[in-house]
Amino acid sequence: MSRVAIITGAASGIGRSTAHRLIGQGWSVVGLDVSFGSELATSDKVDGLKTLYCDVTNEGSIVDAFGTIASTYGHVDAIVCSAGKLEIGPLSEMPVEDFDRLYQVNTRGAWLCARQSIPLMRKSPHRDKFPRIVFLGSIAGIRPKVSGGAYGAQKAALHVITSVMAAELGPEGILVNAVAPGTVDTPMVQAKSDSSKTGDYRPSGNSPLGRVAAPEDIAAVIEFLLGEQANYVTGAIIPADGGTRAAFIPPAVQG
């Protein structure tokens, strides 16, 4: 019986790249996204990917999507919660509606999807090696920066959720980890780069490597966390920021 993975936010960016990698490793992958249709279908963009509509801000939509997955596959071995939303700007000026919308996707939605997957993980026939939960955190949740306060705060909350769920689910053999990327060249970040004048999302991503991450760079870390080499890794928040945090010099001491 094949391993079954769910990936939220699978229509583009990190989610799509992760789906491609896992399918190449023999996984059966169901991608969830608001841009997909309401019936389980085969993607015309990623060979082997099954797609299904899901709005992670709506608990009913999540329940419906997972019900379809349960009736089709009977179990789940892994979930990658990569659906995300980015808004930048001063916390003191951010509209409440924008803050709430970010929270609904980045924190609450990720937690709801992970929670909904647990009963299906308990039915996995591969309990000797799985299940796994991987959240998409952010380096912004480790090293806050001006203009990214709301996003960083909500990703920091997700890091706490990762740690606590790892402790809660460890006795059942369910591993829970998070990847904390720096700037990644995704449509979401590109859109903010085009509209932002803050400089925080410029093409180099402030990395000493001189470039931002490609989605494939982050997907590779996720693939590791879902593989046998990570059998003893749980509760980890793994930075994948190209050295951005290591090279950070506070503005007050620059000069």
What are these regions (language model features)?
Residues 92, 143-149, 171, 210, ...:
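Active-site loop immediately N-terminal to the catalytic Tyr-X3-Lys motif
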Residues 138:
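Residue(s) in the substrate-gating loop at a strand-loop-helix junction
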Residues 119, 167-171, 231:
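Alpha-helical segment proximal to the catalytic Tyr-Lys
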Residues 223, 234-255:
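Short C-terminal tail/terminal secondary-structure segment
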Residues 114, 154:
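Active-site helix of classical SDR
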Residues 90-91, 98-103, 203:
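Substrate-binding pocket helix/loop in short-chain dehydrogenase/reductase
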Residues 80, 170, 175, 233-235:
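Short, small/polar-rich loop/turn modules that mediate ligand/substrate recognition or access, typified
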